[in-house]
Amino acid sequence: IESPAQTRLNKKAQVETFEELAITSSLVRPAGASYCLQFIDRHRKMKMGVRDWEFLHPSLEPILSETHDVCAFQEDVTKICHHVAGLSFKQADKIRKMMNSLHEGSVEDRLWIETEREFLAGCIKNSGLTVEQARELWMRVSSFTGFSFCKSHSASYAQLSFKCTYLKAHYPAQFLAAVISNNHGFYSKDAYINEARRWGIRILPLDINKSGIKYVGKHNWMRPGIMHVRNLTDKTSSRIVEEKGIREFANVEDFISRVGAYRHEVENLVLAGAFDGFGLNQPELLYVIDGIYGRHRSLAENGLQFDVFGTRDRHPNHSDYSLTEKCLNELHILGFMLSGNILDILDLHPKSKGTVPAGEIANFVGKGIKVFGWPVTERVHTVSTTGKTMMFLTLEDQTGSMDVIFWPRNYGRFADVLAKPGPYEVWGKVTEEWDTHCLEAVNIRSAEWSPSQIDFELASQRLTRSAGYVYTDLPGIVAA
């Protein structure tokens, strides 16, 4: 239920119960998507005690009362074919299977035409539908083609969704840590990290003595695991956990001596911040590592025994990396930033330069605005009636996420821009439909960037001013 389409549908339909979620979980699939608006309109009115519609035929009420005369599940098709059209359950199930795998071709077309004739005749003879009613019902049934859910499948999704929603509401740190640790959900891992920040969860530093392989959350904090460190092998990860279980690592020399990791693995751990608790800054740690592995290579070439502690304390003072440099290193090593946000680095912060934060677009319905955002998901959609292409895009800033729509007339103009990684600067008009808001885009610019274009000092100042990112360890927090 976390996809943008499902989230919008649930909000529009005012979904509150398990049964309602089971219905919308199926309606959002391709087979039922064309009836979503009809269901939403009727469902919202029914919640207010208003019913301004009638069933196409009384025989449909026992089958479609829960979904307000809308086909939502595969069983709806089977029941209509059997109870209304008078077909056998075997014939009805055959039609259901045909609809889920309908392909164009002379044989399929001929079979479908024969099925239609049998269905229409059965509705008229068995249930007393008029010709017009029978044709309307066939149009509904035949349009319910493509991927859809049976009710038990949709209910199982709803059950899992309710459990996850409860966990996120009451144990957000634990839940989000588990989502990230298990290869995340619908969105990328950095989207869940940013979501945790918006929930007030402190993202603690990666720490070789306190981090496990997976992420751990508790109370109002989350500790990253080492699982996303670039090129860190499973063997080395397991060895780290095994050795720190015996005793904590005293310094980087102790780590190398006991774990026996490759040089690039140790360097990546340094740049991810895992050794920041050893009293040396990252450039100094890299200098020590260079000395250890350089000495090892030299001694090995001369057939001499290597002593990893032979280089201890042999390092000059080095200036630490700026906060911006650390963020960019994290992006390279982890795939996301632990210590900051790319929008701050690029000076694309909400409320700057006349932009509207994602969390406030609901206040600008009917108005033209500009937003900055990092893309978290997108979906290209072909309009069935015209064959033209449009895009649904979800952008994120420090305040939340927002849905952006590029209608066909604009998607064609900006498809080349949307192919770039972002972040994006988007102009458009805010619209509202059934309590949901989106931005109908009219223009877009990709904020292309590279490290060479960044003013590191100014960017670091912006990162420092942006609250909620960099945290030292908190008292009482133990190893994961």
Short names for language-model regions:
Residues 1-480:
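Noncatalytic, beta-rich nucleic-acid-contacting surfaces in large DNA/RNA-processing enzymes
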